[in-house]
Amino acid sequence: MEFSQHFQKLIDDMRLDGRYRTFAELERIAGEFPTALWHGPDGQARRVTVWCSNDYLGMGQNAEVLAAMHRSIDLSGAGTGGTRNISGTNRQHVALEAELADLHGKESALIFTSGWISNLAALGTLGKILPECAIFSDALNHNSMIEGIRRSGAERFIFHHNDPVHLDRLLSSVDPARPKIVAFESVYSMDGDIAPIAEICDVAERHGALTYLDEVHAVGLYGPRGGGISDRDGLADRVTIIEGTLAKAFGVMGGYVSGPSLLMDVIRSMSDSFIFTTSICPHLAAGALAAVRHVKAHPDERRRQAENAVRLKVLLQKAGLPVLDTPSHILPVMVGEAHLCRSISEALLARHAIYVQPINYPTVARGQERFRLTPTPFHTTSHMEALVEALLAVGRDLGWAMSRRAA
């Protein structure tokens, strides 16, 4: 059978409706974040300012993190040589898991190769092994959570986004004796809004449900030690399992879950996604360990990052640009049309040396295309002013209707 025509049509259709993804070839420069080298289609390298990185605190460039990674490579080499069960558990893994458990005030933690895998593994395993399990999932949960729930085979109930009343109604419709999990996020990555964690925990506790909180876009950034929104609001002890990433505010790579030792042991012992994969490299674990320890002890980066997020939002609002008024560090600038969003992004890069990736369907709904700006502690006022001026200039040239939209 000839498959090429089918595959070509899929690609052509994606190009036609603006879903086709092109990757900007960027080379990060140690010590110069958020500046990077962009290797353009003409083969030339050009210095650009990055405005959409998930390295929220610049920990990927932090001297302590880099030194820890170099030491680990010199000591242990590159890879682990096995799964966690077969020769692949390194001292760095054990120390990192203990540090993450402490970060969230939990008994235990378990690291994975990515945050996507940690959600897939934890939700997929718990939903599968709990008899007659029902999982209640926020309508805007991340793809990794959706896939984990789907993989579990558990019955899924979708509650309206950040709506404890609807969650309560759905939980009330289920047999009280059934095992139940409520899965939600703290900071939602595309809209930048924050979950009402206390209210959701109130509802879950009334119905005897476990709570599973994805803090991927909050760990490192909120709370006295960077434990996330649950840390900031003093709610970590009310959440059964807290999931996070090592690849955003901590600047390295990997994901994790933290919670009661018994639940972590069950996931460790029964998750295919944990059992049958090579463990993360020792130098990645060492770098993440250094990053977590640094963030716990040094609040300055997250304070400056929060200040810069407010500063940029004010500049965007004053310029009349359609930025959502979010309570978090994520600043969505709404465009509303896929091809226009991509054209603006390309013009910003080519004309103004500013890199902002367009966010189109299926990451967001059609008609909700946007840019997702993520200020860091290292963006300056000059960077911000240049971004606003470039957005206005490119917007005028391309006919972008920039009047502010209600959030």
Curated annotation (Swiss-Prot):
The region annotated as signal peptide is none
- The entry's substrate-binding residues are 21, 137, 363
Lineage of this protein's species?
Answer: Bacteria, Pseudomonadati, Pseudomonadota, Alphaproteobacteria, Rhodobacterales
Q: Origin, by domain of life?
A: Bacteria
Tell me the keywords, alphabetical order: Acyltransferase, Heme biosynthesis, Pyridoxal phosphate, Transferase
Q: Which GO terms describe its biological process?
A: protoporphyrinogen IX biosynthetic process
Q: Which GO terms describe its molecular function?
A: 5-aminolevulinate synthase activity; pyridoxal phosphate binding
PANTHER family (alphabetical): 2-AMINO-3-KETOBUTYRATE COENZYME A LIGASE, MITOCHONDRIAL, CLASS II AMINOTRANSFERASE/8-AMINO-7-OXONONANOATE SYNTHASE
PROSITE patterns xref list: AA_TRANSFER_CLASS_2
Under which EC number(s) is this enzyme classified? 2.3.1.37
Pathway the protein contributes to: Porphyrin-containing compound metabolism; protoporphyrin-IX biosynthesis; 5-aminolevulinate from glycine: step 1/1
Q: How does it assemble?
A: Homodimer.
Please list the residues that bind pyridoxal 5'-phosphate.
Answer: 189, 217, 245, 277-278
To which protein family does this belong?
Belongs to the class-II pyridoxal-phosphate-dependent aminotransferase family.
Name of this chain's protein: 5-aminolevulinate synthase 2
Q: Which cofactor does it need?
A: pyridoxal 5'-phosphate
